[in-house]
Design a protein with these regions (language model features):
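Amphipathic alpha-helical interaction surfaces in cytosolic regulatory modules
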Residues: 56, 61-64, 68-111
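A cross-taxonomic marker for long C-terminal extensions/tails that follow the last structured domain
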Residues: 104-148
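A short, well-ordered alpha-helical element
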Residues: 40-62
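Generic structural hydrophobic/aromatic packing signal, biased to beta-strands
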Residues: 31, 52, 94-96
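STAS-typified acidic loop motif
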Residues: 2-48
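Short low-complexity stretches enriched in small and charged residues
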Residues: 17-24, 49-56, 120-128
Length: 148
């Protein structure tokens, strides 16, 4: 298989990303994923966290919008890195937008929905048509509604 060069490697054999937008003033980022998310064999969450997310966290990013419509499969393991990531965002949040239902089911099987908001109103099909700030405001309002 060949991956279009516009996708960036995170150090995983099967999972690639595009950082679509980051606003360091507001403290949010939009990251799109493609491929197979494999925590069981490759520990992709550790690779993602160490190589990408920790850098963003140090720069003040605390709200993560993860676009998952191109995730082909998910193989879970434990939730340690997800819990760690959740704890580190403090006043922020993690939102999984447009993840396929079967991937959400696998996330829930490993209790990752305790750390990442997903499903329901976060299935935003028209996210590509929204300006990044409008997209952030929409997701943020949906998260705030869930937390209230």
């Amino acid at each position: 298989y060949f991956i279009d060069p516009s996708w960036d490697s995170i150090g995983s054999e099967t999972l690639y990303i595009k950082i679509l937008y980051t606003d360091y003033t507001i403290g949010f980022t939009v990251i799109e994923f493609i491929g197979e998310w494999n925590d069981a064999i490759n520990n992709d969450i550790m690779t993602l966290k160490r190589n990408i997310l920790e850098i963003m966290l140090k720069e003040g990013v605390s709200k993560f919008i993860l676009i998952g419509e191109n995730i082909l499969n998910f193989h879970g393991s434990d939730d340690c890195y997800y819990e760690e990531w959740f704890d580190e965002v403090e006043d922020g949040w993690l939102a999984a937008v447009s993840f396929p239902d079967f991937v959400q089911d696998e996330f829930k099987k490993y209790h990752l929905d305790s750390y990442i908001n997903m499903g329901g109103t976060l299935q935003i099909d028209n996210w590509r048509t929204l300006h990044p700030l409008n997209f952030y405001e929409l997701v943020s309002s949906l998260i705030q509604r869930r937390l209230s």
